C-alpha cells in the first residue's frame, strides 16, 4: 500500500486535475482511495459531490478529512493499493504544518507545476522545506501544457532546467483540454469523459503517467 501526496506551494497548477484523473486511471487496475485534506478549498469534495448528484460512478473511493492523522488509520485498514492525498495550495504557516503532518505519513510525493518561470521558485521551496528534509522520493509533473508551439518550447525549457538542477520529473506532461476545464463542473474524470479524439488524448496522458509511476514504484521494491 502506498500513500501518494500531491502538493505545491503555488495554487492553480492543476493539482486537483492531476489527483482525480490519475486516481481514475490507476483505479482501472488497482484499489484506489482519494483523500481531500484541503478543507479551505474542498475542490475535490465539491467535484465528488457533483459526480454523485449527476449519477456518475467514480471508479475510486473518496473521503474528505480534516485531520491528517487519519492517514495512519487508512494505511492500517489496508483496503487500498494506492491512496492519493490532495493538500492546500500554499505554504502559509497553518497549511505548511498540515502538509508536514501529511508528509510524515507519505510514501511518495508528486509536485505539479506549470511550464512558466514563476513556477520554479515555489516548487524549489516546497521541495527544500518539506520534501527533502524527510527523505521522501518525489517527481515533478509538468501540467497545464497548452498545445501550441510557444508553450511546447517553455515545457522543453522547463524539463532542461529541472534536469540541470537534478530535480527528478516524469517525462509525460499533462496537456490542457477543454474537458479538463469542464470536469469539476460536470463531475467527470478522464475515464467517464464523452469519447472524442481530444478526450482519448487526455486519457492517454494519464495512462502514460500511471505507467511511469508504476515502473518507478516497482523498482523501489528491488
Task: Give the positions of each predicted feature.
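Walker A/P-loop phosphate-binding motif and the immediately C-terminal alpha-helix
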Residues: 2-37
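P-loop NTPase switch/communication element
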Residues: 40-58
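Switch II (G3) loop of P-loop NTPases
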Residues: 77-99
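Inter-motif core of Ras-like GTPase G domains
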Residues: 95-116
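G-domain G4 guanine-recognition motif of GTPases
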Residues: 114, 138-153, 172-183
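Conserved C-terminal guanine-recognition region of P-loop GTPase G domains, centered on the G4
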Residues: 121-135
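Beta-strand-loop-alpha "switch" segments that mediate conformational coupling across diverse proteins
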Residues: 158-191
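Inter-lobe coupling/hinge region of RecA-like P-loop helicase motors
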Residues: 182-207
Amino acid at each position: 500500500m502506498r500513500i501518494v501526496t500531491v502538493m505545491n506551494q503555488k495554487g492553480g497548477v492543476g493539482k486537483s486535475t492531476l489527483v482525480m484523473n490519475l486516481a481514475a486511471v490507476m483505479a482501472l487496475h488497482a484499489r484506489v482511495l482519494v483523500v481531500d485534506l484541503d478543507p479551505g478549498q474542498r475542490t475535490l469534495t465539491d467535484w465528488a459531490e457533483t459526480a454523485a448528484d449527476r449519477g456518475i460512478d467514480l471508479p475510486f473511493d473518496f473521503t474528505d478529512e480534516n485531520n491528517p492523522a487519519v492517514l495512519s488509520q487508512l494505511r492500517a485498514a489496508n483496503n487500498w493499493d494506492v491512496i492519493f492525498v490532495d493538500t492546500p495550495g500554499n505554504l502559509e504557516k497553518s497549511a505548511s504544518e498540515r502538509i508536514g503532518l501529511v508528509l510524515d505519513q507519505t510514501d511518495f510525493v508528486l509536485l505539479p507545476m506549470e511550464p512558466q518561470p514563476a513556477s520554479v521558485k515555489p516548487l524549489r521551496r516546497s521541495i527544500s522545506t518539506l520534501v527533502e528534509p524527510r527523505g521522501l522520493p518525489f517527481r515533478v509533473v509538468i501540467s497545464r501544457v497548452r498545445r501550441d508551439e510557444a508553450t511546447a518550447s517553455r515545457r522543453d525549457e522547463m524539463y532542461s532546467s529541472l534536469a540541470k538542477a537534478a530535480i527528478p520529473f516524469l517525462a509525460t506532461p499533462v496537456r490542457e483540454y477543454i474537458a479538463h476545464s469542464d470536469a469539476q463542473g460536470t463531475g467527470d474524470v478522464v475515464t467517464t469523459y464523452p469519447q472524442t479524439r481530444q478526450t482519448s488524448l487526455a486519457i492517454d496522458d494519464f495512462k502514460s503517467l500511471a505507467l511511469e509511476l508504476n515502473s518507478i514504484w516497482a523498482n523501489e521494491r528491488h
